[in-house]
A protein has these predicted regions:
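Conserved functional acidic sites
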Residues: 55-333
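Post-signal peptide N-terminal segment of mature Sec-exported envelope proteins
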Residues: 36-64
Length: 333
């Protein structure tokens, strides 16, 4: 579970390149994009699992997580025939309009103690066809405090995430290409080992948010990629009033996410405001302790959106160079 997307890694969020001289966020950030990764690739940070209310389960070694779907199922079968207008993502709790950009600001412990942490999400007008379905491309940039320069931010991850909405209003997660950087070594490129695309190596797409939010009493599948031991599940907890820096909202939808294949435990809570999207990320028992709130939200102008498009297409092209799974997809356009 990466972060967050308008939904939302997530968190774990999930999770993507702004350092090519183009930055939207008004803070001190830096990073570099080398042309090739080092030999050794590193795994992304821990995903989340098991709520405090759930019964205890056996601890297993980290290198042998339980590959189980006992805690979530595909309650909505995937069928490409049900996507007549997949790029129109107008779900009340997760609208994705090209040019929408928002920032979640907070803190997380990524192994260096609790540090400041910002994630910038941009809904692009780039299209990526996956399994024959035209998908909306979300550009996700994760900035963390630079250990060598406290008070400044450095790019830790840059990601392309793909979404589509079916005719019943379910928002589907259709894959991710996350590039990772070592912030303890000046932002050195580490590759993109946690890439997943539905239909390749047994990977399954899942739903970010179901269309009928009243039908969410049990856990439902968000994504499953056995080759990288990635399994995310979510359930709907209810609605509430919630306040963040950009405002206070009624009828905020609360979801609970977990990663049953990860023995380390923890849940991630996400909060979606009607007509706005993911305004808050919180945790229950998650060792990473990620807490984020929406600190800004705006609509990009035509020039800004064009600059985003260029960066996203460049990142898409890099995917064919650095990841064998991604190399099996069609180029974005």
């Amino acid at each position: 579970m990466r972060r967050q997307y308008p939904g939302w890694s997530w968190i774990t969020a999930i999770v993507i390149v702004s350092m090519f001289g183009f930055v939207f966020v008004g803070c001190s950030e830096r990073g570099a994009m080398p042309t090739a990764p080092p030999t050794a690739q590193r795994s992304s940070s821990a995903s989340l699992m098991a709520s405090q209310a759930d019964p205890p389960r056996e601890r297993v070694p980290e290198n042998k997580p339980k590959e189980t779907v006992d805690y979530c199922t595909t309650i909505i079968p995937f069928s490409s025939a049900t996507f007549s207008n997949p790029r129109r993502i107008d779900h009340p709790y997760s609208p994705m309009v090209p040019g929408l950009q928002y920032t979640l600001t907070g803190e997380a412990n990524r192994g260096l103690g609790v540090k400041p942490h910002d994630v910038v999400f941009t809904v692009t007008d780039v299209v990526k066809v996956i399994n024959g379905i035209e998908c909306v491309v979300l550009w996700d940039r994760d900035f963390q405090e630079d250990p060598a320069n406290p008070g400044t931010k450095i790019l830790a991850e840059v990601e392309l995430a793909f979404f589509a909405q079916d005719d019943a209003g379910n928002v589907w997660m259709m894959g991710e290409y996350p590039e990772e950087f070592d912030i303890t070594n000046g932002g050195e490129f580490q590759g993109a080992p946690n890439t997943w695309i539905p239909g390749i190596a047994g990977t399954e797409a899942g739903t970010l948010i179901i269309g009928d939010t009243k039908n969410g009493s049990g856990y439902y599948l968000q994504a499953r990629a056995p080759s990288i031991r990635f399994l995310d599940c979510a359930r709907i907890l209810g609605t509430e009033v919630n306040c963040v820096p950009v405002g206070c909202f009624n009828n905020v939808l609360v979801t609970d996410e977990r990663a049953p294949a990860d023995w380390r435990g923890g849940h991630q809570r996400k909060y979606y405001a009607p007509g706005v999207g993911n305004i808050r990320v919180d945790f229950r028992g998650d060792p990473e302790g990620e807490v984020l709130v929406m600190s800004s939200r705006k609509q990009l102008n035509a020039a800004e959106l064009a600059a985003v498009r260029a960066e996203v297409l460049r990142l898409d092209a890099r995917g064919f160079q650095f990841n064998d799974v991604y190399a099996q997809t069609a180029p974005a356009r």
